[in-house]
């Protein structure tokens, strides 16, 4: 089964390296896999200011963050393929990639996969949930040809 993906990528900031819409689509399709036949998703690439504002408003943390996930929740009687929105801060992703000695492409892929898994209902608050989510992330990232994102460099 192939995922029918409607992806809207919004580039709301400039940077030396931002993935293409094709890269984002590949990473989203890899993360979603066979869990849905159709999916609609928006990925918004933002600067630190917008990320900090959203993180403060929705998570009570007054600092920019790498990725925020906003799942769409329709009433039970309504079936829509709308998965939700990801907001990714380019500056934070770049800084983390440098600090973790990863390529930008690998870290962007990881953030997209991580965010999509949140949209699918995965979480990492409890240790057991975190282990399950990280294991799945690692499998997906490695299937894309990147190394384990949680392996110490």
From Swiss-Prot:
Its cofactor is Zn(2+). Binds 1 zinc ion. InterPro entries: MetalPrtase_cat_dom_sf_prd (IPR023091), YbeY (IPR002036), YbeY_CS (IPR020549). Keywords: Cytoplasm, Endonuclease, Hydrolase, Metal-binding, Nuclease, Ribosome biogenesis, rRNA processing, Zinc. Pfam families: YbeY. It is found in: Cytoplasm. It comes from the Bacteria. Belongs to the endoribonuclease YbeY family. This is Endoribonuclease YbeY. The gene is ybeY.
